[in-house]
Amino acid sequence: MTDSTRSLRNCLAPAKLNLFLHITGRRPNGYHDLQSVFQLLNWGDTLHFTRRDDGRVARVTDVPGVPEESDLVVRAANLLKAHTDTAHGVDIEIDKILPMGAGLGGGSSDAATTLLALNRLWQLDLPRAELQSLAVKLGADVPFFIFGKNAFAEGIGEELAEVELPTRWFLVVTPRVHVPTAEIFSDELLTRDTKPVTIADFLAQQTSDAEWPDSFGRNDMQEVVTRKYAEVAQVVKWLYDVTPARMTGSGASVFAAFHSKHEAEAAKAKLPASWNGAVAESLNEHPLFAFAS
């Protein structure tokens, strides 16, 4: 990352994985209570920010299928600008590599990186808690990326507690299908009454010799998604022939863990050509963590 008084270049917006995802209830307002562990990855979109003195917020790169006015990156910048009444503006460039509708948190991570980067570039010095309260307005996953550590999540995903996770290499496989999150959450067959677990339950599994991630929990959305989307079911089956695997978020991406980069790359080399595969190492901390206190 390059840092100057007028620009911030090469700011990573890391992907996340849901190591498990349990839905424990549904609220009267339609939101779902969940439990999950969010894992940061050293892989994601890259954003570049150049300060403007005319107060305008502009996305200067095209993102296919995402109009500028509805882009979470632009919305995040405008939200922060309105909250602080700063006179500054910004040009935002996005090198987009994370697939959309994949359960990797791409748009949410882009928004969080924008809030963190502009907190530094605009010299706002807002505390992390204040940025997290703004982030909730942009989406349920955005506060996690501001939190900036691997986390045990509860509530709708906004109640976060840091967890220490071992270093792992992951193969993340995404078929060419977009899975709308709202469609999966509204499915009548979705499990919504999984028994709550504790952080201690999860951490005890981390030191066991059982196969991982099969050794703890599940993704309650996976059964619904694989029933609706044959492409996702095919990825799960293919990966299971290699090693235990699990869908992240509401899909469509599926991940498997490996002890080394070499093992993950070897599995990736065998993927069908129609699937997008990426090898990524786990992260313990968001790359822009120091941009808020």
Curated annotation (Swiss-Prot):
Key words of the record: ATP-binding, Isoprene biosynthesis, Kinase, Nucleotide-binding, Transferase
What parts of the sequence cross the membrane? none
Enzyme Commission numbers on file: 2.7.1.148
What chemistry does it catalyse, as a reaction equation? 4-CDP-2-C-methyl-D-erythritol + ATP = 4-CDP-2-C-methyl-D-erythritol 2-phosphate + ADP + H(+)
Pathway in which this enzyme or protein is active: Isoprenoid biosynthesis; isopentenyl diphosphate biosynthesis via DXP pathway; isopentenyl diphosphate from 1-deoxy-D-xylulose 5-phosphate: step 3/6
- Please, one GO biological process term? terpenoid biosynthetic process
Enumerate the GO terms in the molecular function aspect: 4-(cytidine 5'-diphospho)-2-C-methyl-D-erythritol kinase activity; ATP binding
Q: Record-annotated residues binding ATP?
A: 99-109
Tell me yes or no: is Methyltransferase among this UniProt entry's keywords. Answer: no
Instruction: Report the active site residues.
Output: 16, 141
Q: Which SUPFAM superfamilies match?
A: GHMP Kinase, C-terminal domain (SSF55060), Ribosomal protein S5 domain 2-like (SSF54211)
Report the family membership. Belongs to the GHMP kinase family. IspE subfamily.
What job does the chain carry out? Catalyzes the phosphorylation of the position 2 hydroxy group of 4-diphosphocytidyl-2C-methyl-D-erythritol.
Question: What NCBIfam families does this protein's entry cite?
Answer: ispE, PRK14608.1
This chain belongs to the protein called 4-diphosphocytidyl-2-C-methyl-D-erythritol kinase
